[in-house]
Amino acid sequence: MKTEVKIIEDSISEAGARLTTFQLAYPRVIHAEVMTHRVFSRNASSSRAIPVAKMVASIADDPFMPMYWGLNEPGMQSRKELTDQMGVKAAKALWSHAARVCARVATDLYELCGLHKQLVNRILEPFSSISVIVSSTSYENFFALRCHPDAEPHIQHLAWKMADLYYTGPQPTVRKADEWHLPYVSAAERESLPLETQKVCSVARCARVSYRTHDGASPSVEKDTELYNRLLGGLDKGDGEPGHLSPLEHQATPLADGKAASGNFVGWQQFRQTIPGQATPFDYAKAVARGWRDMADLLSAREDEDPSVLVRR
């Protein structure tokens, strides 16, 4: 499993504020550490949406296999690596065995028990990759923490690939006032499509990482528009149904003040912040009346059951 890093869109305002969008693929086991950086706008492929057979096949073909076998010692860091060749061979064999067992159990839960992929795929996550789109005006803290030798080795690997590209790659494109940072919108589309349509297409294409990996398929403005409208949900109806608006955070236009904030961006007006009602209010009483809490009540009634009884058997 390779850690893949691409810069999809890189822009800098005339005031000097830089906005960069990365497309990433990395081991699922380090995703929680990426998620701790709240200045990031991100969308990621969800194991709730990927068919079980596809997840199992990806693990069979290309499972996550640690590239650094750190020896046990006190604390969070492992400074010494397992170097004995027989030991490394045994560790890889045991890890591969665990992946095969989990794949078999996941398949049985799906085929024999008829369970949904949102549950079954959880078993496969330690061996899977995840595709992520990240946009931010502030990467310095991420690099300072995750490029440091104290960071977990595999997130160091990701962070250094990102830092190398960020600092030594091509220079960002200068965007003037009223010009837009639009990931996945081609130069030809910038010439041929109205600006509002370009925004819609960019939003939908950023969102699709949640449903499928970008595979080079020809984009469709019609399908992009359909997905965009689904993401907005009930915002235009005022019925309290939440929108799914995180894909609207990757598009932005420069602010005159390079230090002014908009959402989690600095120096750029974030598209999401221009959408009326983008922060959906929560009506507790109405949610209860609609039955939104039914699942939580069901699980509350079951959480005192002792699963260890089954495990010990």
Annotate the PLM regions.
Residues M1-R313:
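A conserved ligand/cofactor-binding region detector
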